[in-house]
Regions:
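Cytosolic regulatory regions built on CNB/CRP/Popeye-like sensor folds
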Residues: 1-153
Length: 153
């Protein structure tokens, strides 16, 4: 019963829309399900892991130096930067609410996602949208600093 609920949640994730039910079940079985309580840390900045996470339920908070960067929800993925670059984690992530996630390692990713151009394209679109949002924040912050400097001249 729990597996059916998880598979249904996984099916809602945009990066999994392209899998047929049997493939989706294989993806799920190749991953590792994690259950986190509110405020429980999934990973910390600078930790070394090469895993990607898909949120099955709940919300996760991405933060750096205790400043919130983003809140991700069911269907979203996270941990992609360290996963793709094989570098330490660039931020920390904790459960914003109780949450369930599917942890995907590189072996499973290359077996199921990499051969699927539509899934890879969806991942690229999400990363691009996140970069665009980050640029908007940077520009707004720069403008705020500039306005503050002019105010005190």
């Amino acid at each position: 019963m729990e597996t059916l609920k998880d598979l249904e949640a996984l099916k809602q994730a945009p990066i999994c829309h392209f899998f047929r039910d049997a493939e989706l079940e294989r993806v799920y079985n190749a991953g590792k399900k994690l259950t986190l309580k509110k405020d429980q840390v999934l990973f910390s900045e600078n930790s070394v892991q090469e895993t990607l996470y898909i949120i099955l339920s709940g919300k996760m908070e991405v933060y750096k130096k205790q400043k919130q960067i983003a809140v991700r929800e069911a269907g979203d993925f996270l941990g992609e930067m360290a996963f793709l670059e094989s570098n330490p984690r660039s931020a920390s992530v904790r459960a914003f609410t109780d949450a369930e996630l599917l942890e995907i390692d590189k072996k499973a990713f290359f077996k199921f996602f990499a051969p699927n151009p539509k899934a890879v394209w969806e991942i690229l679109k999400v990363i691009s949208a996140r970069n665009r949002a980050d640029l908007d924040v940077i520009v707004a912050s720069y403008q705020e600093i500039r306005n503050s400097r002019e105010k005190y001249r």
